[in-house]
């Protein structure tokens, strides 16, 4: 068996299948590596075995060796423990970002290099370019499927060793390629949601690890209107799952989460979807990561996303002495959520990003006791 030049992360999905197929057409020695990131907990909801069988089948069709590695321990300590800690603190984390940084482009990359590979390839919708002496992370050609948001924590050494073979494809084209190539995953449904939760009920799953504590749901004036099953089950702007029935003297309209007081275990809601309590013009981040190793300048203009698939929002970024950033948006943003990722762009190029620490949304700022000043950025 020849040493593979490239190890492909085969997930059992159609995207990684076509990534492997494209590389196979080039004639270089390749191998597939399937990684298991979550141990079967006996719930019957784990899709890992089905995905592994599909990955084996794809490798068979393409005539490339199949390898398996169990990273469930690394995932638990590097991703899941952080996920639980963030929810316990009342924040809403993004485990996919951390998984890419801590597992897929760290432990997986190490495993591939141990097999003798020079580079790895994955089925992400993103692109890499080398310009100005630095590796650049670019959006995928399919804007609806672009995954650069989840890859913004990657650095130079990782990008230098990574290929994104499907980054220049539209999803519809990719499906057609998979069908014409006879890949067994060509009609497989895309996976959605948090990988380790799958199709399970989110509250039931989270309740296994974080004991729920019921508390009051209040309106912005502090009047009690209902009871919640646990404050960490909810995120800013959320409508579903509140189970607020008819409230005397209130319109029969939906309610939206506008604030969480973790210390008092109180959830605040409003019937205005675009409530002023959800609006923010500024945010403060934790320490930022820059794909090229440094920010473009101490202060610069660019666009930002504060959640996946959000339209680009023009903003001004001020880099702080501690490595964090403060961001001023040109227009108010709805439900910017601490714990989620701020990702910055210059056109198609992903500059980097950071975890959102605080915003100037009125209620969240009051509940957090934040010292963040909206006057910092003019």
Swiss-Prot record:
Transmembrane segments: none annotated. The keyword Phosphoprotein does not apply. The record marks 124, 340 as: Interaction with tRNA. It is found in: Cytoplasm. Its main location: cytoplasm. PANTHER family: MITOCHONDRIAL TRNA-SPECIFIC 2-THIOURIDYLASE 1, TRNA 5-METHYLAMINOMETHYL-2-THIOURIDYLATE -METHYLTRANSFERASE. This is tRNA-specific 2-thiouridylase MnmA. It comes from Xanthomonas oryzae pv. oryzae (strain KACC10331 / KXO85). The gene is mnmA.
């Amino acid at each position: 068996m020849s040493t593979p030049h490239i190890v492909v992360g085969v997930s059992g999905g159609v995207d990684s299948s076509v990534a492997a197929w494209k590389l196979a057409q080039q004639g270089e020695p390749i191998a597939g590596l399937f990684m298991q990131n979550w141990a079967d907990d006996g719930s019957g909801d784990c899709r890992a075995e089905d995905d592994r069988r599909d990955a084996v089948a794809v490798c068979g069709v393409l005539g490339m060796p199949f390898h398996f590695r169990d990273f469930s321990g690394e995932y638990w300590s590097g991703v899941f423990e952080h996920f639980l800690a963030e929810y316990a603190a009342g924040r809403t984390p993004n485990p996919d970002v951390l998984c890419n940084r801590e597992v897929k482009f760290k432990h997986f990359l190490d495993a591939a290099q141990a097999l003798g590979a020079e580079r790895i390839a994955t089925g992400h919708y993103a692109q890499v370019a080398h310009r100005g002496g630095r590796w650049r992370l670019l959006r995928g050609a399919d804007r609806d499927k672009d995954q650069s948001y989840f890859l913004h924590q990657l650095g130079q050494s990782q990008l230098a060793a990574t290929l994104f073979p499907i980054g220049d494809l539209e999803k519809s084209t990719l499906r057609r390629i998979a069908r014409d190539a006879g890949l067994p995953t060509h009609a497989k449904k895309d996976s959605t949601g948090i990988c380790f939760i799958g199709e399970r009920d989110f509250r039931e799953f989270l309740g296994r690890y974080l004991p729920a504590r019921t508390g009051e749901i209040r309106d912005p004036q502090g009047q009690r209107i209902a009871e919640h099953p646990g404050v960490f089950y909810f995120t800013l702007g959320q409508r579903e799952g509140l189970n607020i029935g008819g409230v005397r003297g209130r319109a029969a309209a939906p309610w939206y989460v506008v604030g969480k007081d973790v210390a008092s275990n109180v959830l605040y809601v409003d019937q205005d979807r675009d409530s002023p309590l959800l609006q923010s013009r500024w945010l403060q981040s934790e320490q930022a990561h820059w794909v090229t190793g440094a920010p473009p300048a101490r202060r610069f203009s660019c666009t930002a996303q504060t959640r996946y698939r959000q339209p680009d929002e023009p903003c001004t970024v001020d880099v702080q002495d501690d490595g964090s950033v403060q961001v001023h948006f040109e227009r108010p943003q709805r439900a910017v959520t601490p714990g989620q990722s701020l990702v910055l762009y210059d056109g198609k190029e992903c500059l980097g990003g950071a975890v959102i620490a605080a915003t100037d949304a009125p209620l969240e700022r009051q509940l957090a006791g934040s010292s963040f000043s909206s006057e910092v950025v003019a």
